[in-house]
């Protein structure tokens, strides 16, 4: 009897312990159901906390891309209702999740990135600057008119200190005309140099209009640097004079002798260019020096 009574007491104690454990387990699901991380069923409502991740702000409806492709059980992805009216073969359907992601540097809920200078702002600043320059020019003109300056409105047509542009300006008329003239004379460009687009060469060596001495002897220059032909135009296409007919061989090949003996160009007194190319179609003979 004692053994049966002890067994009954142990069985009763175990039954009480199991009942208490079952009661405590029934009370816990109400607390943990709101923070459960298990995916809900197909008919269960979505209980996802739509907060931005801690790495960066991606917008109100933006979500990070999930590297794993789980279209059926991806409860972290976008709502299936967003793509319900699209075909599965469309490009946007394939890249819909990627295209609807907010950029990593998204500023604000529906805002855009900050642009420091816009086109409208630059146009406004440009107009303000032009208006300020006009006011300064008008103010300067009025001050000069009030001071009685007669030179207002005069257009100078010569550069006061040498060549200062394509069509230089004259020095302003005043008491320093002589000084300006001397300054212009001293600031001339050197001999045989270009004085601008509309300028001319210095007149001190006008009779030396030949190419300078160089190793290449230029294509249209002459070999001698300071040979003076009295400003005559020496031809290249001149003809032989009748007095030099005796130099021919007599058999009608007088013109061919220059092909065999080209030095006759230098020795013969004819209308050929004595030393290189010195013209194109002139007719005047070269004067003997």
Swiss-Prot record:
Function: Tachykinins are active peptides which excite neurons, evoke behavioral responses, are potent vasodilators and secretagogues, and contract (directly or indirectly) many smooth muscles. Stimulates gut muscle contractions.
Cleaved propeptide residues: 25-49, 285-289
Composition bias type Basic and acidic residues, residue spans: 62-72
Organism: Drosophila pseudoobscura pseudoobscura (Fruit fly)
Modified residues (Valine amide): 155
Biological process, per Gene Ontology: neuropeptide signaling pathway; positive regulation of hindgut contraction; tachykinin receptor signaling pathway
Signal peptide: 1-24
Protein name: Tachykinins
A GO cellular component entry from the record: extracellular space
């Amino acid at each position: 009897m004692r053994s049966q009574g002890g067994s009954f007491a142990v069985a009763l104690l175990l039954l009480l312990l199991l009942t208490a454990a079952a009661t405590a387990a029934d009370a816990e699901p109400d607390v943990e159901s709101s923070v459960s991380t298990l995916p809900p069923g197909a008919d269960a409502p979505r209980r996802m906390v739509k907060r931005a991740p801690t790495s960066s702000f991606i917008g109100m409806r933006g979500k990070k891309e999930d590297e794993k492709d789980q279209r059926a059980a991806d409860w972290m992805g976008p709502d299936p209702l967003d793509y319900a009216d699209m075909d599965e073969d469309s490009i946007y359907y394939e890249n819909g999740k990627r295209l609807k992601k907010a950029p990593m540097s998204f500023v604000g809920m529906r805002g855009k990135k900050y642009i420091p200078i816009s086109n409208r702002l630059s146009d406004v600043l440009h107009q303000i600057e032009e208006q300020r320059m006009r006011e300064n020019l008008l103010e300067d003109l009025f001050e000069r008119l009030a001071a009685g300056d007669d030179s207002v409105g005069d257009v100078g047509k010569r550069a006061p200190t040498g060549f200062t542009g394509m069509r230089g300006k004259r020095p302003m008329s005043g008491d320093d005309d002589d000084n300006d003239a001397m300054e212009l004379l001293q600031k001339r460009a050197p001999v045989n140099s270009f004085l601008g687009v509309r300028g001319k060469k210095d007149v001190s060596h006008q009779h030396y209009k030949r190419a300078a001495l160089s190793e290449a002897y230029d294509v249209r220059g002459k070999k001698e640097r300071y040979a003076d032909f009295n400003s005559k135009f020496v031809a290249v296409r001149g003809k032989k004079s009748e007095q030099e007919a005796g130099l021919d061989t007599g058999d009608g090949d007088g013109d061919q002798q220059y092909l065999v003996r080209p030095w006759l160009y230098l020795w013969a007194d004819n209308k050929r260019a004595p030393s290189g190319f010195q013209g194109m179609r002139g007719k005047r003979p070269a004067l003997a020096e």
